Amino acid sequence: KVIALKDVTMKLKKGEIMCLLGDNGAGKSTLIKTLAGVHKPDEGEIVIEGEKTVFDSPKDALDMGIGTVYQDLALVPLMSVTRNFFMGREPLKGPPFLKTFDIEKANQIAAERMGQIGIDVRDPSQAVGTMSGGERQCLAISRAIYFGAKVLVLDEPTSALGVHQASMVLKYIVKAAS
């Protein structure tokens, strides 16, 4: 029997930033996936705002305000900034029986949210693959916050980034925490 996590206790308060460090195979990814609702703990409990919580799926974690940004970012390089920002949660317009994607509103929201973090998206229809690694990371974080994340779990948010891009991402993380 493999014990991936043992005696893990974490307490986070609003605005806090916590960094989890450990060797390869130490259980960091398992903890992240447990907090994200991918894995269920065999024992122990997850307590959020004083309530014991069980996640049956990643959607349950999202519904509780836990937004996870994985190392691969879950972005589609050939899709636009706007499409990647909304990813299945697009704003809709029209009558209830014939709703369509409100691209104008979506473009406006995506550009505004990216602008709030200092990234000028002149054309929200541009492919995400044309953005720098730091800009893509900030897009993924901004998306999680926009859709209600109270707690952001970031899996290696600066890996494979240059010094300037890593600095941009870390500044945004600090800004998001405040």
Each model region followed by its residue ranges:
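Glycine-rich phosphate-binding loops of nucleotide-dependent enzymes
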Residues: K1-S178
